[in-house]
Amino acid sequence: MSLWINGEWRPGRGPGFSKQDPVNLKVVWQGEAADAGQVAEAVAAARQAFPSWARLPFAARQAIVEKFAALLEASKAELTAVIGAETGKPRWEAAGEVTAMINKVAISVKAYHVRTGEQHSDLPDGAATLRHRPHGVLAVFGPYNFPGHLPNGHIVPALLAGNTVVFKPSELTPRSGEAVVKLWQQAGLPAGVLNLVQGGRETGEALSGQADIDGLLFTGSSTTGFHLHRQLAGQPQKILALEMGGNNPLIVDDPRDVDAVVHLTIQSAFITAGQRCTCARRLLVRRGEAGDAFLSRLVTVSQRLIPAAWDAEPQPFLGGLISEQAAQKVHQAWLQRVAAGAVTLLEPRLLQAGTSLLTPGIVDMSDVANVEDEEVFGPLLGVWRYDTFEEAIALANATRFGLSCGLISPEREKFDRLLLEARAGIVNWNKPLTGAASTAPFGGTGASGNHRPGAWYAADYCAWPMASLESPTLTLPASLSPGLDFLAGEAS
């Protein structure tokens, strides 16, 4: 039973597909995709459930969402294993993802009240009130790199606001999506409030093309995000929240504590096998002996990063990529850069045929002309050398993306300048690019997206504001506008 529609598990009528553990190649899920008719049924179920769900007191919706958080806590070990086996990420990282899902609930409840609750202002003759109302039926598209945490950042605030949801996980992580929905089912969500449709591109296009959805919340690649934007063009009545990729720069201007800088760089570039949208893709290093020493140390430490299975002991820093195809694609990107004139500082190696185990790669791109401005979603780091800080900022901004940017330097003045000139939604100073706080916005500008998903700021796009001028009584004003004449005794 692949799909959950209107409170019932049912098989899909679309093509069958399966997902393997990308390292040991064991099948972890198999089922069928939803066909277009079943997608329409899921949207219809969400539409039917919307009025009663939206009318529930907020406290009642909150209670169900908090029950979901409690079930996450109780099922943490099991869900960690599901996410780890399906994505290839190490146990410690999969467990951290589940913890982030749990923490998201309390933050989302607070964000609802602070950002989208009711606000009242007294007026001389009444009051002004700001309220927020749910959009209706929202489609949520989940990515594969954080198959629990990132969709959760859309679904939790959407449900708290009173929306109903049709959720399509990535076709590369169907088991994680199913496991999370089963916890929502146990939490007591009414039938139709949350629906699950599995499948790939055809299922996704059927969902985004549904006339009866009121919006679409997406986290994933820029290629897919741009396609969705085109598909929904001319429909301003629908909310479209896109959080996409990045070609993110990390500027190493003054690496004084070399090992600390190397550690930060590895955390920025290679965590999650480079499969975070905020990962550093471009390392900008000042020319000179200090930069040379830093790069030498970075290569030395990075070549010790040997990926292994999600449940390997001792636990590795890196697991596998999401699939063998993903690992091959990153390896091909390295070969293309070498063919274009890049100098390999650390060669990425495919460790075992048929698996997704890929070691990190580092290539010096300083002398390569006409570099394609695309996100390589994996552990491949390009290096560019520069002479002046002005040149570094220009290199950092030489991208159509605008997700994250970082500076390693003891000089606050340089960070202040970067804050003014960087074109990115996240700008960090002596902190990894991959670090994020749930109370801060997460997202970018340009080709990186148009909204800020996750907890605090997700509340903004999960409800629309309603303004009211209110008075319990109505009396004729003592002073009338020019041209109005109400003579006493004329009214009958």
Curated annotation (Swiss-Prot):
It holds the Pfam family Aldedh. NAD(+) binds at residues 220-225. Pathway: Amino-acid degradation; L-arginine degradation via AST pathway; L-glutamate and succinate from L-arginine: step 4/5. Catalyzes the NAD-dependent reduction of succinylglutamate semialdehyde into succinylglutamate. GO terms for molecular function: succinylglutamate-semialdehyde dehydrogenase activity. This is N-succinylglutamate 5-semialdehyde dehydrogenase. The gene is astD. Keywords: Arginine metabolism, NAD, Oxidoreductase. It comes from Klebsiella pneumoniae subsp. pneumoniae (strain ATCC 700721 / MGH 78578). PROSITE patterns: ALDEHYDE_DEHYDR_CYS (PS00070), ALDEHYDE_DEHYDR_GLU (PS00687). Its EC number is 1.2.1.71. Belongs to the aldehyde dehydrogenase family. AstD subfamily. GO terms for biological process: arginine catabolic process to glutamate; arginine catabolic process to succinate. InterPro entries: Ald_DH/histidinol_DH, Ald_DH_C, Ald_DH_CS_CYS, Ald_DH_CS_GLU, Ald_DH_N, Aldehyde_DH_dom, Aldehyde_DH_Superfamily, SuccinylGlu_semiald_DH_AstD.
